[in-house]
A protein has these predicted regions:
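Glycine/proline-centered hinge or cleavage motifs at structural transition points of membrane proteins
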Residues: 190-191, 204
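Short glycine/proline-centered loop/turn elements that form peptide/ligand docking sites
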Residues: 179-183, 283
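Membrane-water interface segments at the C-terminal ends of transmembrane alpha-helices
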Residues: 7-42, 57-146, 150-177, 201-225, ...
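Glycine-rich helix-loop "coupling/hinge" segments at transmembrane-helix boundaries
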Residues: 45-50, 125, 225-251, 287
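Short cytosolic juxtamembrane segments of multi-pass membrane proteins
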Residues: 276-287
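The alpha-helix within a helix-turn-helix
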Residues: 187
């Protein structure tokens, strides 16, 4: 009994730095942000600690509400395309032999060795009118005149896909790698076609990984304002851009905090939906 008690005491002491770190750098900033969202802005960068709901009411104004709608549209479009591209990559990556899996993981992680901003500036060279993409398309005879892709909505979607696609691939890969392929083989032996076996077995069992990838791509794509700034030419204003603008030029920290709180609530709701769906799937599997 004494040994068990000593072990539990030592474990508690070892976890103490983690608790302190979480409280100081996560809990306290969140409390401050939520409190700030109910404060009243004053001139300059000042804040008057007077309770108000105006910051949240302002979000419902057409100009700000439209920003949320546009951000949701962009996030939804980007996530669908990323899922359609990322799922097959993650699935086939899990089917590779062990020595090739490591090479594939290395190639997938390679872009993270370079800063995202630098990589996005590379896309400016590719997407501009005299860029590589238009050059290749014209040489192949697919187009006669160069396309105006840069500083447009499609350019932002391309940037989102480029930055966030690895997260989807790794999420699907981690889920597909744990899949017991004997279930698929059993379905095939019982007369199911490859397509039927995929939708009834593979897709259902890898759904948690797909949903995890959706969360890892949908939520950031609403706030990655630097992609919209670089590839979109400020034609699309995201929630992240709005928060940055209110924190700097707008000098309205309480309103920026309110926007951040709404984003945090949206993220929490998505995670709760994900957990509910995955738990339901696990219960179905047990049943």
């Amino acid at each position: 009994m004494k040994k068990r008690r000593n072990r539990s005491d030592s474990s508690a002491w070892m976890a103490l730095p983690l608790y302190i770190f979480t409280i100081v750098f996560v809990v306290c900033p969140l409390i401050y942000m939520v409190t700030l969202s109910f404060a009243t802005p004053s001139r300059g960068f000042g804040v008057t600690w007077k309770f108000t709901l105006d910051n949240y009411r302002n979000i419902l104004e057409p100009v700000y509400l439209n920003t949320f709608v546009e951000s949701l549209k962009l996030a939804f479009t980007s996530t669908i395309v990323i899922a359609l591209i990322g799922y097959p990559f993650g699935y086939f990556m899990a089917r590779l032999p062990e020595h090739r899996k490591k090479k594939a993981q290395l190639l997938l992680s390679a872009p993270f060795w370079v800063n995202s901003l630098i990589r996005l500036y590379g896309w400016i060279i590719i997407l501009q009118k005299k860029g590589l993409l238009n050059f290749v398309l014209m040489k192949l005879g697919i187009i006669e005149k160069p396309l105006s892709i840069l500083y447009s909505y499609p350019a932002i979607v391309i940037g989102m896909i480029y930055v966030l696609l690895p997260f989807m691939i790794m999420s699907v890969y981690s889920s597909a790698e744990k899949l017991d392929w004997s279930y698929v083989e059993a379905a095939r032996d019982l007369g199911a076609s490859r397509l039927q076996a995929f939708f009834t077995i593979t897709l259902k069992l890898t759904l948690p990984g797909l949903l995890s990838g959706v969360i890892l791509t949908f939520v950031p794509s609403m706030g990655l304002f630097f992609i919209a700034d670089i590839l979109g030419g400020n034609k699309v204003v995201l929630v992240g851009s709005l928060i940055q603008d209110q924190m700097t030029r707008g000098s309205n920290w309480p309103f920026a905090a309110a926007l951040a709180v709404v984003m945090m609530v949206l993220t929490t709701v998505l995670i709760m939906i994900y957990r509910k769906v995955t738990n339901a799937r696990e219960l179905e599997g047990i049943g």
